[in-house]
């Protein structure tokens, strides 16, 4: 017996949903002038006014997960990661949502982590689960490999103020984080910290003269009265290095010295005598 049950299609109907209760924690970025905030909620990109105006859903892509949104420093673009193709790819779109999104990467083969804009708004750097650190030029869409780790994913990457250097963290076989600097000009990386201590979170000073990082190198143990053991509970401190030989450390040792005054009134003249003066002295000597 053939049986059919008619329904009113309630499950497939559109409905209004309060997306504010589905904002993804930690996935937000403030516009460079502070007037709008961008977030991801229910897999879509949104921008929210700081005080007055409308909330915009920029993507409206059911079935697609968009995340890791970042506002370009010049305020023009939003960069984000989307699985619209079935794999994680990086896109940019204008912050007003008027223009169509632009796909920057292709052939995605693994999970991508957060993207970070260069200060000149021309490049994006990110790391992935295949232990790669890469950046892409948003104009040419050229992807460049910065570093290939062997044991663990890279820590967060940060740009220098002139967009010519990238500071990043990598763990090697000892699983101890180390801070490196990558030059976009030479395509080479330089180890900044040593192999003895855990270090991470390299960040440039606004003037580009210093690199700050967090390192576990403060060994001040606390002795337990019950466990008969030592606890190293507060090893992490903030440190910095100067990035040029000509840069003086603001914490360089100082040594006050006494300024010795020189008495110039009794100083003997060393000015050569003229020929006339020499003849006069010669005549005085002959007369005596």
Task: Enumerate the language-model features and the residues they cover.
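Short consensus segments that form the blades of beta-propeller domains
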Residues: 35-37, 81-83, 123-124, 169-171, ...
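Residue-level detector of Asp-centered blade-edge/turn motifs that repeat once per structural unit
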Residues: 32-33, 73-74, 119-120, 161-162, ...
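Hydrophobic beta-strand positions that form the internal "hydrophobic ladder"
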Residues: 37, 75-78, 121-124, 163-166, ...
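Structural motif
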Residues: 46, 87-91, 132-134, 175-179, ...
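Multi-bladed beta-propeller domains
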Residues: 1-23, 49-67, 82, 93-113, ...
